[in-house]
Design a protein with these regions (language model features):
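Active-site "lid/cap" and pocket-lining segments within catalytic core domains
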Residues: 1-182
């Protein structure tokens, strides 16, 4: 059973497996897509959980030990956590938020990787997030997939970088028009 095209084109698989393994939940690990509607990572997780008869858990964590961490950013993330909790609750989805703090820093994703039948996360192709995702993928028994929810033309679909905005605009005109007319 394949994902619908509009979701499949946004996926970058970090393993050869593309279906959940075992009976554990499908975990959606949110790192940067803090919205409850039109969130392709959550949509992929919901679709996989539903079609493979697995529970769904949406996980969101915050730890201050990363480059350029700031109070302003953390306030925005924690405000988003409140909105996510309310929004996912209205949709009947299980959402958990973990705030790491001194004296309480369990390796939540390591633990979830051992329980999950599959991990879905938002594609954020910058360090240290790329390293974190690779580390979790190496621990996980089931498949791990990154889903682009930031771009109209998904990064896995276009797949290359350009040095000028007009070059990208011209190269993706047809793809952009197709997606906007869906």
């Amino acid at each position: 059973m394949d994902l619908p095209e509009h979701l499949a084109e946004r996926c970058r698989w970090l393993s050869d497996q593309t279906v959940p393994v075992g009976d554990g939940p499908v975990i959606v690990w949110l790192k940067s897509l803090f919205r409850t509607h039109e969130n392709p990572a959550v949509d992929v997780g919901r679709w996989m959980a539903h079609h493979h008869d697995r529970p769904l858990l949406i996980y969101h964590g915050l730890d201050e030990r990363y480059p350029h961490a700031s109070l302003r950013h953390h306030n925005a993330v924690m405000d988003a956590a409140v909105d996510l909790h309310r929004g996912f609750k209205k949709q009947g989805l299980r959402y958990v938020f973990h705030l790491a703090r001194e004296g309480h820093r369990p390796s939540v994703m390591k633990r979830l990787a051992g329980q999950a039948s599959m991990i879905v996360t938002d594609l954020f192709p910058l360090p240290p997030w790329t390293d974190w995702v690779r580390s979790v993928a190496d621990m996980a028994d089931g498949p791990v997939v990154e889903v682009d929810g930031h771009c109209v033309i998904p990064m896995p679909l276009y797949g290359r970088s350009v040095d000028r905005p007009f070059k990208f605009r011209n190269a993706t005109k047809k793809l952009r028009k197709q997606r906007l007319q869906r």
